[in-house]
Amino acid sequence: MLAELNAEVLENTYISGNLYRLTLRIPDKILKQIEPGHFAMIKPSDTYDPMGRRAFAVADIEEHKAVFYYDVYGKGTYLLSKRKPGERLKTFLPLGKRLFSYEGDKHLLIGGGVGLAGLTLLAKKLRDMGKKVFIAYGGRSREHLGMVEWLEKEEFPYELFTNDGSAGRKGFVTEILKEFSTDWVVHACGPKPMLKTIKEMKTGHKVYFSLEERMACGWGVCLGCVVKTRDGKFKRVCYEGPVMPMEEVIL
């Protein structure tokens, strides 16, 4: 059941680079409905400038709380970064129809930048199911790997990649694919060039993309988040996604 809330801000903390962590108070009856892949549409300010909401993956769930990570890259997220604990944000969740597959016993999660936030709830779910999980996390530099603290707290096996070599291995996070056999199911979330590279590598893995597109509504009405599919049609990321098999989409 979708819910529209005036959710209380519990935390809105700068992490590093452009990354912030936002924690909202959410009723437990709503939290119980949230599955990996679900997202929320959050209005960053109480004004009409900007008018629209912004889409954020639900990165973690705690008692009475939902956690989100976001990069500040425009007016909306800048205004969001200024919101203080105790203030309230118009929040619509849980959104997303097509969610992650749990098939297979071994799962490689590839997160690029803030895209890792789209995979963290999945990682915990798979672990709870007794699945083997490995996380590869990449960014431009050390300061763009702000979710390392989460990885360490949750004690997942992981490897870091940075373009400039300032943390972890120097290179692109997609290189990790060459080191895992094809019986590992791959889940990836991050910038479109990263996803495109994974698709072009043709490693033979079963791959699922959690897609990130700009959204105005979040429930399939505005058609602002469509992606082209191999059958020549278009699918709405918010409604026929956000998770789609790699072979379905054209990037």
Swiss-Prot record:
Q: Name one GO molecular function term.
A: oxidoreductase activity
Q: InterPro entries of this UniProt entry?
A: Cyt_c3_hydrogenase_gsu, Dihydroorotate_DH_ele_sf, Dihydroorotate_DH_Fe-S-bd, FAD-bd_FR_type, FNR_nucleotide-bd, PyrK_electron_transfer, Riboflavin_synthase-like_b-brl
**Which GO terms fall under biological process for this protein?**
pyrimidine nucleotide biosynthetic process
Q: Which keywords annotate this record?
A: 2Fe-2S, Electron transport, FAD, Flavoprotein, Iron, Iron-sulfur, Metal-binding, Transport
- All residue ranges annotated as the FAD-binding FR-type domain in the record: 2-101
Is the keyword Iron in the record?
yes
Keyword set includes Transport? yes
Cofactor binding note of this UniProt entry: Binds 1 [2Fe-2S] cluster per subunit.
Pfam assignment, any one: DHODB_Fe-S_bind
Which sites bind [2Fe-2S] cluster? Answer: 217, 222, 225, 238
Question: Required co-factor?
Answer: [2Fe-2S] cluster; FAD
Cited PROSITE patterns: FAD_FR
**PANTHER family given in the database record:** DIHYDROOROTATE DEHYDROGENASE B (NAD(+)), ELECTRON TRANSFER SUBUNIT, DIHYDROOROTATE DEHYDROGENASE B (NAD(+)), ELECTRON TRANSFER SUBUNIT-RELATED
Give the record's family classification.
Answer: Belongs to the PyrK family.
**Identification of the protein by name:** Dihydroorotate dehydrogenase B (NAD(+)), electron transfer subunit homolog
> Which species is listed as the source?
Aquifex aeolicus (strain VF5)
